[in-house]
Amino acid sequence: GSVVRAEMLQHRASGEAGGNMVLFERGEGKTYVAQSGLIGQTAGDVPTHLTPFKLLSTERSLAEGQDALVVKLASEPVGGVQLVRTYTFKRGSYLVDVRQEVLNQGTAAVAPQLYVQLVRDGTLIHEGPDVWGAPQSYTGPAFYTTEAKFQKVPFEKIDKKDAEFQKSASDGWVSMVQHYFTSVWLHPAAGAREFFARHQAGNLYAVGMLFPVGDVAPGATSTVDTQLYMGPQEEMKLKDVSEGLELVKDYGWTHLLAKPLFWLLFHIHNLVGNWGWAIVLLVVLLKAAFYGLNASAYRSMAKMKALNPRIQALRESLKDNPQQMQQEMMKIYREEKVNPIGGCLPILIQIPVFIALYWVLLSS
């Protein structure tokens, strides 16, 4: 019943000529899967992600003209409880509806919990210049709740058992983030949920949510609707899926500046239809926006250059009297209406903007 392979048919894998990007995968040297199951009063009394599931659907692919593909699986009954999982794949969407139905085939009421989790190995996928101190993309878990907002939880924090994130809420989602792509478990309906992050054997990390299913009487069925997103970090689409989901796109500390830059880049691309030209035009617009600052800086530097002989002469004549030298220099600056830092300040103001632009290009 686990999702063990998800291949992005419209995205090529970096460094693999002719190969598609594979997000979920379970094989030698790599583990990245989506799992769900039940937790009962005692171990082994309800189906888990380890329980064998049987495919009930006959359709395996989305037919021409069909908008949705429904794939239904049912677990073997465990302790009189059966878990039926229905995946609904929609054409043109990376968001999959996952309906979880708990059937009580026993003679006594049960009240299990449903868990959904993302499990992957701790291999970091960093993208960015191979230069010390250069920004690198984030790989690891992230949580979101309306109260605590977006919370990154690096693998090393989980190892040290000092990961800080909201442990329970009435809304929110959990994700695994890597460069360009993400996977997310969502429970759209408001309701109590618990969040967890743990280190498993074999350098594996599991992050997920727990939901109460409620009392299920004998012969009754309880349903929990969840969703699984597995795909690229397309910001404009992610924001429509769930609150805060666009935040999985990592802009580092430049977030406030990077967001409007990406918005502008996105709309320029819509006009010209080419990302390369969109980037060129964005840089031209930024240079035009900063033209006044740059002109001011160049004028200030030109004035400082013209004053340089007088300043040098002053330093030579008053080198034994630093205080008077400083006073005379400030007098010259006032008389000539020159700001000694006027050539640097306009440039310094622009630096955060272009760092933010770097993050936009790195993340997009």
Regions found by a protein language model. Give the residues of each.
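Soluble non-transmembrane domains of integral membrane proteins
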Residues: 1-247
